[in-house]
């Protein structure tokens, strides 16, 4: 467990917002997914894909999903990807990083993969990433953190604006330091 696990469970768990269980065991037989499940979700038309765990230049650690798995996509409804972890957007590396592959991918000559992707270009820090994501979600769904009182204008409730909102939330928040 991370140092701030109790803070997160107290806020988002059954004693406050109720978004998560008190312990992972309460999730039942959930295994965390795999590359096939990720591709099936995207190919079925998922609007938004969120990954918040370990990442590297060519993909995600848990569940394992890499640039080569993107070749299994056949979607024509493009998804938006929040890849909030280390290095998946490392555009300055030799060759194509994970975010570039996701964004440029085509299937049978048609755009496939992602319409847009938000990904870190360098190493990022876990609890800071969590706090950033909470700010993004509260911008897109203002009731996510009811006590934060965000009031974005309707045109601002989009993934691109959520990126900025997450940064403002992180700057104003004491979360990473609790």
Where are these regions (language model features)?
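Cysteine-dependent hydrolase recognition
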Residues: 1-178
């Amino acid at each position: 467990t991370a140092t701030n696990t109790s803070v997160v469970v107290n806020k988002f768990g059954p004693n406050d917002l109720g978004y998560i269980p008190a312990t992972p065991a309460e999730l039942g037989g959930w295994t965390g997914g795999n590359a096939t499940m990720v591709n099936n979700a995207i190919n079925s038309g998922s609007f938004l894909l969120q990954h918040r765990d370990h990442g590297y230049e060519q993909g995600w650690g848990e569940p394992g999903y890499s640039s080569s798995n993107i070749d299994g996509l056949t979607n024509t409804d493009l998804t938006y990807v929040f890849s909030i972890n280390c290095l998946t957007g490392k555009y300055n590396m030799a060759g194509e990083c994970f975010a570039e592959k996701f964004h440029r991918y085509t299937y049978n000559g048609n755009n496939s993969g992602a319409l847009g992707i938000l990904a870190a270009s360098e190493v990022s820090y876990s609890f800071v990433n969590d706090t950033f994501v909470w700010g993004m979600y509260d911008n897109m769904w203002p009731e996510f953190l009811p006590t934060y009182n965000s009031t974005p204008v309707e045109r601002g409730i989009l993934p691109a604006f959520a990126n900025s909102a997450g940064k403002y939330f992180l700057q104003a928040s004491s979360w990473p330091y609790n």
